[in-house]
Amino acid sequence: MSPAALDPLAARRVLVVAPHPDDETLGCGGLIARLMALGRLLHTIFLTDGGASHRRSVSWPRPRLAALREHEAAEALAALGAGDSPRTFLRLPDAAMPSEGSDAWIAARDIVINVVTDLQPDLAILPWRRDPHCDHRDGWRLAKEALRHARVDPQILEYAIWLDELGAPEDFPDSGEVQAVHVDISPSVEAKRSALAAHRSQTTDFIDDDPTAFRLRPATIARLTGATELYWRASQ
């Protein structure tokens, strides 16, 4: 893929990095579905266990919730046509990823390096570098370091989940920092919506014993399940 005329659908081997189970769908589910329809290779890395969304639930303690979220992620990938594609769950603590350079961080980075070395992606889809969630920012840094150490140089697209709702002015792209890439997902938008429905712990009252739990708002879902997905790539 030429840097001057990036067509994400021309990618052959694709790496997706999701800070939590559901980010793969919210951020790039439509593109994943279109790539799968074209027979592309995909490997999805889920960084955290997603276990912090219902901290006060008695019926769903963190280990049980984390297992549920992995199951939901598998269902979502299947809805996107990627049910047979490889995926890696790093199971880092949700909202508390290890600090850069720590033993746990290096171990996680090395797993990503191994995936990247085997896959040799020509496209990597990462969270936006300044998305206003600690796991998204930390995940971007970890993925970039893994790519650098693996000496693999794919085209990179970044997706934002929370920027429009929670971002400060300095979180948005600077002038000339990135180029916008709009991907038409109208052929796969229904698959994306079905995939998001698989994440029922995040979209419904499936877990009903924690009144303080996180839940995706209808406005957020509507914003991220339209007919176009927006990505950014670093300006050349």
Predicted regions and their residues:
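Metal-dependent de-N-acetylase/amidase catalytic core
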Residues: 1-17, 38, 60-65, 78-88, ...
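ATP-dependent adenylation/pyrophosphate-handling site
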Residues: 3, 10-21, 25-64
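Generic detector of contiguous secondary-structure segments
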Residues: 24-33, 76, 182, 232-234
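Generic hydrophobic, amphipathic alpha-helix propensity
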Residues: 69-73
